[in-house]
Amino acid sequence: MRRRPGIGGLQKAAAARDQYRLLGENVAKLRTDMMKEQLSTFRSQLEEFARKHKNDIRKNPAFRAQFHEMCANIGVDPLASNKGFWAELLGIGDFYYELGVQIIEVCMLTRSHNGGLISLQELCNHLRQRRKKDREAVTEDDCLRAISKLKVLGSGFEVITIGKKKLVRSVPTELNKDHNQILELAQGQGFVIVEEVQRRLSWTSGRVIDALETLLEEGLAMIDNGHKDGKCRYWFPCVSSVYSSIGSDT
């Protein structure tokens, strides 16, 4: 028979476990301290980098996106406060505040024909038209950052993804799965017809018409019934290039 460890053996084992635990805690603390020191060094280097390349960050969209990525990697948010160090150094807070105001204006001006749902690409095109005289170009990444800041206003602005498109919603319309599937189908031509939706999604005509009627009521769709085949086209400005130029000069 194997002899069980005595009291002395148990005490030695417990002491060894305590030593390993203390050693592990010391190693973890050392690693944490080293990481904090490295992050502090990175932040200092990032501040110096920002001072040196201030104009590039403001004027060059690609450079600005890379700068934001660098900040995110070390937990720095240049947009966290308009009165913060980064906002004062770069004026980034003002840039995104002005962009946010322009986004609201574009969404309001185009709401009558898209129902408050506009593709991110179209929104950027409108903004570029408005800012042609400015030297600060605007990218989709800039728009996404500005919209994320609008959420604090409780204004209902939200970015949703349907199929391959990102859409900006500026009204509190709730889209269900059926609505999203129809919008995804419409991305091909900008419109759908009832029979096509029935065939592609294996739905009943009642289900298709019910979903389309809701989208019409919300102002997200438009009916075109002037075709020789007698089939109504349900157009969706938010995914149709046909309507992308509407309001661009406003």
Curated annotation (Swiss-Prot):
Please tell me one Gene Ontology term that the record gives under cellular component: ESCRT II complex
Q: Write the gene name.
A: VP22-1
**Known role:** Component of the endosomal sorting complex required for transport II (ESCRT-II), which is required for multivesicular body (MVB) formation and sorting of endosomal cargo proteins into MVBs. The ESCRT-II complex is probably involved in the recruitment of the ESCRT-III complex.
Q: Which SUPFAM superfamilies match?
A: Winged helix' DNA-binding domain
Q: Which cysteines are joined by disulfide bonds?
A: none
- Where in or outside the cell is it found? Endosome
Chain segments annotated as coiled-coil in the UniProt record: 35-55
Query: What interactions and quaternary structure are annotated?
Result: Component of the endosomal sorting complex required for transport II (ESCRT-II), composed of VPS22, VPS25 and VPS36.
UniProt entry tagged with the keyword Coiled coil: yes
Family per similarity comment:
Belongs to the SNF8 family.
Q: Which UniProt keywords apply?
A: Coiled coil, Endosome, Protein transport, Transport
Record InterPro entries: ESCRT-2_cplx_Snf8, Snf8/Vps36, WH-like_DNA-bd_sf, WH_DNA-bd_sf
Any one Gene Ontology BP term: multivesicular body sorting pathway
**Major subcellular location class:** other
What is the name attached to this protein's record? Vacuolar protein sorting-associated protein 22 homolog 1
Instruction: Tell me what organism the protein belongs to.
Output: Arabidopsis thaliana
Q: Does the keyword Protein transport apply?
A: yes
